[in-house]
Amino acid sequence: MEDFVRQCFNPMIVELAEKAMKEYGEDPKIETNKFAAICTHLEVCFMYSDFHFIDERGESIIVEPGDPNALLKHRFEIIEGRDRTVAWTVVNSICNTTGVEKPKFLPDLYDYKENRFIEIGVTRREVHIYYLEKANKIKSEKTHIHIFSFTGEEMATKADYTLDEESRARIKTRLFTIRQEMASRGLWDSFRQSERGEETIEERFEITGAMRRLADQSLPPNFSSLENFRAYVDGFEPNGCIEGKLSQMSKEVNARIEPFLKTTPRPLRLPDGPPCSQRSKFLLMDALKLSIEDPSHEGEGIPLYDAIKCMKTFFGWKEPNIVKPHEKGINPNYLLAWKQVLAELQDIENGEKIPKTKNMKKTSQLKWALGENMAPEKVDFEDCKDVSDLKQYDSDEPEPRSLASWIQSEFNKACELTDSSWIELDEIGEDIAPIEHIASMRRNYFTAEVSHCRATEYIMKGVYINTALLNASCAAMDDFQLIPMISKCRTREGRRKTNLYGFIVKGRSHLRNDTDVVNFVSMEFSLTDPRLEPHKWEKYCVLEIGDMLLRTAIGQVSRPMFLYVRTNGTSKIKMKWGMEMRRCLLQSLQQIESMIEAESSVKEKDVTKEFFENKSETWPIGESPKGVEEGSIGKVCRTLLAKSVFNSLYASPQLEGFSAESRKLLLIVQALRDNLEPGTFDLGGLYEAIEECLINDPWVLLNASWFNSFLTHALK
């Protein structure tokens, strides 16, 4: 369609149409039907006015090109196709000189003979429907409406067609030709169906009474009336010279617009310092599961029963000892806490009946680990407002940390496939309407690509842990409840599987506000030796608790089993979001859908099936120091999902700030790649705002390093 438009219409018309679309942020390459419609409308407006003049007696005459009388006055003033500001200026000056009522919308033409504005319509639908829409929109008796259709029909206000028969026939013939040309190229059907109803762009509401008085009172300084302010706003040209506009707005602003060139941007400065450490609420790639297949034991589905059953599958327990202490903590307490969990689980087994929940004894080690009695006493402000040296705690600035390689490994692992399926097909909601047939097809394809993904395991694990912790926090506020960390999946053969990752012990949880914190101690199984990357485990105390026999290609090998223990905390609002982690599936599905939509609109048919089934095609996944990484559509789905999941797992104010500020720089760089000649002011301030968020958060630091790779490749 785009090629057709460029061949079929005069280059000046094409250029005006492109400019008009850009002004409203639309892309002629994507919205090709709209591009064709705008060109057609422009051409009809120009043909309407061509060859029509007014002679000395004020009569309308037709003068063919090349006629010596061409110095006569044009009968029509063309308003359509002009810059908005210029167009309003023309309209205002016509109204001032002729006394005609000012229209609410920009009309297309002014007729000097009949002294009226004209609104031209070109429709692919019924002329009378379109006529009514136009009339409804402009609500003005004074503006004359004239509608043409591609089938040769026309309709005008009071059946007054303004022009002679021959001039109108020229327009109808041209429209018919355009239609035939489109049809012969197979473009007509899509063009005909794409017409929407009238779009209201620039209506001027009349404000009266009290609202009018309020409007006059609430104007910015230096404006005497609402009219005066409106005229100023209308004259504000969106693509004009920004410096001048800024200085008009305020005397204090002096912005120099600097052109943004390939050589302008510098890489983001990542902080120096010790390597960053793991801060997720549970272990990710380092987690180890004790699992039971096809669970059918008594009380199956009750977490404590499931946990005990999983613990019994392992026989390699040994006397625990500390292999990597926590720098600041009392490490023997972590060791005692684990021993207490083992002992209390043993007590349950020795008992008559297994209870549904287990509250731990409030031992000194657990009180210490859960920060019991550590919170400063709260005092009523009334009792202490007279204290002379009342002040807020001094809090230390966070220590800057450098990017460590482990976070990229975590991300890569999250994109990988596991040998189990973590979601059923219905995790993403059901169809409601027939239109959703395509949607459910897309959803099923997408689910097939991500159901086995490790990021999906993290979602289900996060949902489970947060739900269990929030429940316990509300149901057993004063108790140190033992909460197993469990997930469920299906094997490749479709057998159900229940997995135990470890345990959480919850502290006191009188959570009145969304941000009130509940402390918990997490104890998680792992085969990762913490001494390989001690910086990653700074916040953990790691115990060696057993030996596990693993089947490998060379036979069975024994590997030490570790327990990662740490004190952590969360809040009602964080748990609420954690319970909603399935939204990550939806977010990444929507990103994939927009890719499919873009492809479908280029091909002018739905390409969902080809998109997922054409295994040979590769898609851009992301930037790395090597360049743009590409992969299969499944890999794209899993990468987008992993990004969304990590945004949830590593949510933080640093991430919020970095995402918002770096996006501005990203848009400027993309504008440069699209040859839009972007300009900036205070680019230094933008860099400062971005880099202020690069402190110590592993996920933010990784995103910043990806951003630098993007800058390098984007500007080559």
UniProtKB/Swiss-Prot annotation:
Key words of the record: Cap snatching, Endonuclease, Eukaryotic host gene expression shutoff by virus, Eukaryotic host transcription shutoff by virus, Host cytoplasm, Host gene expression shutoff by virus, Host nucleus, Host-virus interaction, Hydrolase, Inhibition of host RNA polymerase II by virus, Manganese, Metal-binding, Nuclease, Phosphoprotein
Gene Ontology biological process: cap snatching; DNA-templated transcription; symbiont-mediated suppression of host gene expression; symbiont-mediated suppression of host mRNA transcription via inhibition of RNA polymerase II activity; viral RNA genome replication; viral translational frameshifting
Residues engaged in binding Mn(2+) 2: E80, D108
Any single Gene Ontology cellular-component annotation: host cell nucleus
Domain of life: Viruses
Modifications after synthesis and translation: Phosphorylated on serines and threonines by host kinases, including human casein kinase II.
Residue interval(s) of motif Nuclear localization signal 1 (NLS1): 124-139
Cystine residue pairs: none
Enzyme Commission number(s) from the entry: 3.1.-.-
Record Gene3D superfamilies: Influenza RNA-dependent RNA polymerase subunit PA, endonuclease domain (3.40.91.90)
Cofactors, names only: Mn(2+)
Chain positions recorded as Mn(2+) 1 binding sites: H41, D108, E119, I120
Motif Nuclear localization signal 2 (NLS2) boundaries: 184-247
Localisation per UniProt entry: Host cytoplasm; Host nucleus
Note accompanying the cofactor annotation: Binds 2 manganese ions per subunit.
Main location class: host cell
GO molecular function terms listed in the Swiss-Prot or TrEMBL record: endonuclease activity; metal ion binding; RNA binding
UniProt-listed HAMAP family: INFV_PA
Protein family membership: Belongs to the influenza viruses PA family.
Subunit description: Influenza RNA polymerase is composed of three subunits: PB1, PB2 and PA. Interacts (via C-terminus) with PB1 (via N-terminus).
Primary role: Plays an essential role in viral RNA transcription and replication by forming the heterotrimeric polymerase complex together with PB1 and PB2 subunits. The complex transcribes viral mRNAs by using a unique mechanism called cap-snatching. It consists in the hijacking and cleavage of host capped pre-mRNAs. These short capped RNAs are then used as primers for viral mRNAs. The PB2 subunit is responsible for the binding of the 5' cap of cellular pre-mRNAs which are subsequently cleaved after 10-13 nucleotides by the PA subunit that carries the endonuclease activity.
Protein name per the record: Polymerase acidic protein
Organism of provenance: Influenza A virus (strain A/Duck/England/1/1956 H11N6)
Taxonomic classification: Viruses, Riboviria, Orthornavirae, Negarnaviricota, Polyploviricotina
